[in-house]
Design a protein with these regions (language model features):
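Active-site-adjacent helix-turn-beta-strand microarchitecture at beta-sheet edges
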Residues: 144-147
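Nucleotide/phosphate-binding catalytic cleft detector across ATP-hydrolyzing
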Residues: 1-11, 17-139, 150-219
Length: 219
């Protein structure tokens, strides 16, 4: 059975997962078709390498490339058929996005798939519905640098929106110590509510069914 490596290059962590796939010729899968052989993450904190002018710094490029090379080395022990790298908000929103991605690719030797906000939201929906059907509701994916909302109707994903506020960016903007104070938590919530209020189609995401996804929602 072939092995595939996936590397998620996020604002906070860079995660490697190597999957053993029962049959890679199929078009549809459930989680039973995959076996995780390794699940390893590095707290890279890439959002800290975004300068005041919005550019991703050279130090950030070196940090990202170093972690990617380490993950690729581990993946090759498993004789992976492919190694796919996906990047999200931290590089997507950088003022020098294309240049930063190209620099990381040169230094790491790996190609990077830079996901649009819409692609990120859709892939989150695909993962959430791999083993179950969600007929309606709003899928909420809180990452380090952004939050994606996806409207689900009749078991399909429709509208989606990316809010430029995630767990790590909220921490950097509002929290001074290790743990947030009640006032700081109110400030984080207030900033998020302002972003939601600015959405012209915010009513489309109102629902009594909320599906949470990704790390910050885990206990």
């Amino acid at each position: 059975m072939p092995n595939y490596a996936v590397i998620d290059l996020g604002s906070n962590t860079i995660r490697l997962v190597v999957y053993e796939v029962k049959d890679d010729r199929r078009k549809t899968y459930s989680s039973k078709d995959f076996k995780s052989l390794i699940n390893d993450k590095v707290m890279a904190g890439l959002s800290a390498f975004v300068a005041d002018d919005g550019t991703f710094t050279d130090d950030g490029v070196r940090r990202a490339a170093s972690v990617l090379k380490g993950h690729a080395k581990r993946a090759r022990y498993f004789d992976c058929k492919r190694i796919d790298v996906f990047a999200t908000a931290v590089l997507r929103n950088a003022a020098n996005s294309a240049e930063a991605v190209a620099a990381i690719e040169r230094e790491s030797g790996l190609a990077i798939n830079l996901l649009s906000a819409a692609d990120e939201a859709h892939l989150g929906f695909v993962g959430a519905t791999c083993d179950r059907t969600i007929e309606r509701g709003t899928l909420v994916d809180i990452g380090g640098g952004s939050t994606e909302l996806t409207r689900i109707e009749d078991g399909r994903d429709f509208d989606n929106v990316s809010l430029g506020q995630g767990s790590l960016s909220s921490y950097a903007a509002f929290v001074r110590a290790i743990l947030p104070t009640p006032e700081e938590m109110d400030a984080v919530a207030g900033a998020l509510f302002e972003r939601l209020a600015a959405l012209s189609d915010r009513d489309a995401y109102r629902t009594d069914v909320v599906v949470w996804q990704s790390g910050p929602q885990r206990p």
